[in-house]
Amino acid sequence: MKRVFLFLITNLAVILVLSFSARLLGVDRFLTSNGLDMGMLLAFAALIGFGGSFISLLMSKTMAKWSTGAQVILRPSNEEESWLLNTVRQLSKKADLAMPEVAIYEGAPNAFATGPSRSKSLVAVSSGLLRSMDRKQVEAVLAHEVAHIQNGDMVTLTLIQGVVNTFVIFLARVFAYALDSFLRRDEDESGSPGIGYWISSIAFEIVFGILASIVVMYFSRKREFRADAGAAALIGDRRPMIEALRALGSLEAGKLPKEMAASGIAGGGMMALFSSHPPLESRIAALESAR
């Protein structure tokens, strides 16, 4: 959850900054000087949309360390840190990956992988997870995160987010232009759009961005199933991953809802649409039915 949530928040912030900068530079005024140029607007939306998404990808590892306070293990100071490094190294070798950075952070049972590429990645695990699971279960969680890197999930998420951003920016300006034209219908429409266009385009970007995250989260849930299967393949046994998921369920049952969400325990109803992880029982069932 942390990996996807941080990416989405960073992406939204970058998109808003780029959009605001474009307004200051007069790009929006150029696009609407003679009515709304749909072709130019689509090109602009794609440039900002994919640009913002890839900037977010490049910032992902730094943002993850900063936001969680994760401490990268450069030289192991105890047996547990040595075991973590060796386990990730072995899993990465099996996955034919360069050794990622390994970090520990304080928090509820959780782990995540992030980074701009397969060769520049980070695997982080919380102190809560290390305290509450046995090593076979922790190894399964680490294998799950290494599988995310092996599958190129951050790059895939970036491309999906780029497409989503493009449509969000495009539609936000189309709706804002239509709203501004309606509000100024009794005025001289020969000039550039009024202040209503600038304000409403930002509002539409935020609203459409939140709604569009449903699409991103849908693909994220699909990638979780694949990472679970990848973890089972790396370990050579699906049972440790199943036990790790069951442990997460028993640890979080009846506890803090936010911690449950962070660990991938999805709620029902509308909230399930905004969850980056499928329900644990669905993930366990998928592993148990795999051959």
Curated annotation (Swiss-Prot):
Gene from which this protein is expressed: htpX
Entry's cofactor comment: Binds 1 zinc ion per subunit.
InterPro entries for this protein: HtpX_protease (IPR050083), Pept_M48_protease_HtpX (IPR022919), Peptidase_M48 (IPR001915)
Native species: Chlorobium phaeovibrioides (strain DSM 265 / 1930)
Cellular compartments per GO CC: plasma membrane
Keywords: Cell inner membrane, Cell membrane, Hydrolase, Membrane, Metal-binding, Metalloprotease, Protease, Transmembrane, Transmembrane helix, Zinc
Family: Belongs to the peptidase M48B family.
Cofactor(s) of this protein: Zn(2+)
Enzyme nomenclature, EC number: 3.4.24.-
Annotated transmembrane regions: 4-24, 38-58, 159-179, 199-219
Superkingdom of origin organism: Bacteria
Annotated GO MF terms: metalloendopeptidase activity; zinc ion binding
GO aspect biological process, one term: proteolysis
Membrane topology: Multi-pass membrane protein
Intracellular or extracellular location(s): Cell inner membrane
Residues annotated as binding Zn(2+): 144, 148, 224
Name of the protein in question: Protease HtpX homolog
Active-site residues per Swiss-Prot or TrEMBL entry: 145
One Pfam short name: Peptidase_M48
